[in-house]
Amino acid sequence: MKKREYANAFFNRIRELNLEPNLVVFPRNQPQLINSRYVEVVKGFRRSEPFEAFVPGEIYHPSFRYSDLIALAKGVDAKLVPRPFTGQMIVEGVVADFLQAIGLDPSSFGGTEIRRNQTAGPFTVSVARDVSRLINNSGRRLTDVQARRCKRKLTPYLQEKGLADTGYCGLSNALARQVEKDWQRDNDVFAQQVWQKPWKEVFAADVGREFTPNDFDIAKPDERTQTQRHQTVKEIMASVEDIMAYPAAPTI
């Protein structure tokens, strides 16, 4: 959406339908965002480096610069509707908040309270990461199609075995404070323009939050968990080998 030609085409189509274009966005405090981003790319079998190696290459990702959204909304003549993506919103439901933002009553829709994309936990991240490392070490690469198939295999398998977990954290307090410091100025520019408040006031429960990393690369699990992890990696890898045996789209 940040590519102007795509944004123009999208919002022009909205106007052709005689609808008023609104740009609903969910800015999030960057440390929590980068933590979530890491989980998604690892769980999707697209990355396998340690969290601390992932952060430097992603910390200045364009999607983290929320002030650009103001210019984007003005450029396509759309109303910007910013909804702070906080821990409270996660609990209360993002879908319900979105429906309210576009003027709809969430009670008219079923299942708005269900969380459909919960952040995976350290066990899930570790298994997916180890499988990706095994693939990379063998000199092979997954195609986009194969990676999606692997992801679809992983979650049901862990759920069936009772091993699915949530709540991964790769952040340390020092790393989180550094990320917040790097984005403080841009965040305040955005927050003052759209909410007339400083960023830390809008995200009071998120800015300065304490973190304890539970990544298995950092906090080694107990022997029983390690045994389960090694067995799970072995079994998932067998499924991945079957997936890779079939030709698919170009590699990632």
Where are these regions (language model features)?
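Anion-recognition interface
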Residues: 1-252
